[in-house]
Each structure stands twice: as structure tokens, then as C-alpha cells.
């Protein structure tokens, strides 16, 4: 259950986070182990483990998350571009089972990442 993850604890303010954005649907905070000068996680407040669990009823929420990433990127001054990543499941490298979008930027990012 994604309510019991570290992200659920951040949403409930049980543990601290460097929050950069919040609205009724989502929360965004700086990653504690950044992989780029700007590394922010955007998460829904609604508990969804990953994209495998997303349904058509989540369509508006998923769109909202992406537009929130765009707004935060602008707020952070990422005018030259940025990367968004959603890891899904063990084979996709997901370690926290609460859907989240990584926003990475502030430097040139190589491909493939690893």
C-alpha cells in the first residue's frame, strides 16, 4: 500500500521534506539523493503504487502531475530542458511503491542513463 511508504509519511508530514510545491492533488519535494543539480519528485496525494495500477479514472490526475512538472521546471529555471522519469515495478527500478515522477535538470543529461 502506498499510504505506508516514505512518500505517504511525507504527505502526512510525519517526516520532513524540502517541499517546493503543493496543491490539493499533488506534492513536490527535492530528492534526498539528487542525481542532478535539480532533482525533484512529484507525487500524487492519492495512493497509486505505480503506472501498472493506474486506470482510466486516474487520467486527469496523471495529466495534472505532468503539467505540475512543467510548472516546477519553469519555477526552477530549467529553460534549456529537463528529463522526466517514472520507474515502474522492480524491473523498471522502482524502489518506493507510490507513483512518482522524477524531474531532473540543471545540467546536460546523457542517454542511455544506465
UniProtKB/Swiss-Prot annotation:
Domain HIT: residue ranges: 6-114
InterPro entries linked to this entry: Histidine_triad_CS, Histidine_triad_HIT, HIT-like, HIT-like_sf
Transmembrane segments: none
UniProt cross-references to Gene3D superfamilies, sorted A to Z: HIT-like
Top-rank lineage group of the source organism: Bacteria
GO molecular function, one term: catalytic activity
Motif range (Histidine triad motif): 98-102
Coiled-coil residues: none
Protein name as catalogued: Uncharacterized HIT-like protein Synpcc7942_1390
Species the sequence originates in: Synechococcus elongatus (strain ATCC 33912 / PCC 7942 / FACHB-805) (Anacystis nidulans R2)
Amino acid at each position: 500500500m502506498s499510504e505506508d511508504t516514505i512518500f505517504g509519511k511525507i504527505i502526512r508530514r510525519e517526516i520532513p521534506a524540502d517541499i517546493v510545491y503543493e496543491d490539493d492533488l499533488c506534492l513536490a519535494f527535492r530528492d534526498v539523493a539528487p542525481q542532478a543539480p535539480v532533482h525533484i519528485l512529484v507525487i500524487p496525494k492519492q495512493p497509486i503504487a505505480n503506472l501498472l495500477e493506474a486506470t482510466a479514472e486516474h487520467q486527469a490526475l496523471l495529466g495534472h502531475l505532468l503539467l505540475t512538472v512543467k510548472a516546477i521546471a519553469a519555477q526552477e529555471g530549467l529553460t534549456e530542458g529537463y528529463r522526466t522519469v517514472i520507474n515502474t515495478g522492480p524491473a523498471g527500478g522502482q524502489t518506493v511503491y507510490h507513483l512518482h515522477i522524477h524531474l531532473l535538470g540543471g545540467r546536460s543529461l546523457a542517454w542511455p542513463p544506465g
